Amino acid sequence: DTQPAEWNDYWTKLSTLAAGNSLPECLQMDYSYLAQYVAADLLVDLTPYVENGTLDVSNVSEGIQDASSIDGKMYAVCAGVNAPALFYNKTLLDSLGITVKDNMTVDEFESIAREVYEKSGVKTDLPYSAGDNYLPYAMRAHGVTKLFNEDSLNVTDAASLVPGFQIYEDGVKDGWVIGADVHAELTSNSVEQSPLVYFSSEATQSWCGFFWSNQLSAMVAAAPEGMEIGI
């Protein structure tokens, strides 16, 4: 018997179950929450089951196993891996004669965003709540390859951080970035409520969205009829 839920609702529900000591025997976990649940002694150490052969992870790479482990103990079995992805309205961009290439720089992305806005009035949706994925990529363009060190942000001054936030300020001021006021009325991180597929006007519509590669099928399903989603 499974009990699926939308992303935010899922973690709220799981937290409630954890507080009541009534977590299910098997649950889906995310890397960003793993340490928190282990620290609260809510997850079983699976290492003995790997060692006695009950769990066969021989075909799982060491790096993937490490992602499921805390302090050398395995607390989860990886169900799959994915990567941050840019989804975009291919139908719109094709009509505007704009091509999205792989491995864009931040400057190239901004150039496309401005061109889309100038030609169509459609804006760009930059991550607000999911900025922990976007910000490291923006910072990497300025030589910062790791967001945090052991004690703090892995920067000596704000110079490396500013460009990642400056694009928001400049974009909102110039009109091509969707403002936080639009997101305030949406469910955070929801595919179905992404401005890429959920909008009422050009002011609330985006030509793109930052998500995870394994959410492509959900985004395609949520897209309005006639909209092709590119990745």
Task: List each language-model region with its residue ranges.
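Early extracytoplasmic/lumenal segment of secretory-pathway proteins
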Residues: 1-32
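Short helices/loops that flank or line small-molecule/ion binding pockets
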Residues: 11-23, 93, 111-115, 188-209
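Hinge/lid segment of periplasmic solute-binding proteins
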Residues: 31-83, 107
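A ligand-binding cleft/hinge motif common to bilobed small-molecule-binding domains
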Residues: 34-38, 212-227
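Short, solvent-exposed loop/beta-turn-alpha elements that line the ligand-binding surface or hinge
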Residues: 47-60, 102, 125, 145-166, ...
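Short glycine- and hydrophobic/aromatic-rich loop-to-beta-strand nucleating segment
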Residues: 84-88
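Extracytoplasmic/periplasmic substrate-recognition and gating elements
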Residues: 96, 174, 221-231
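Glycine-centered hinge/linker elements that transmit conformational signals in sensory
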Residues: 113-114, 153-190
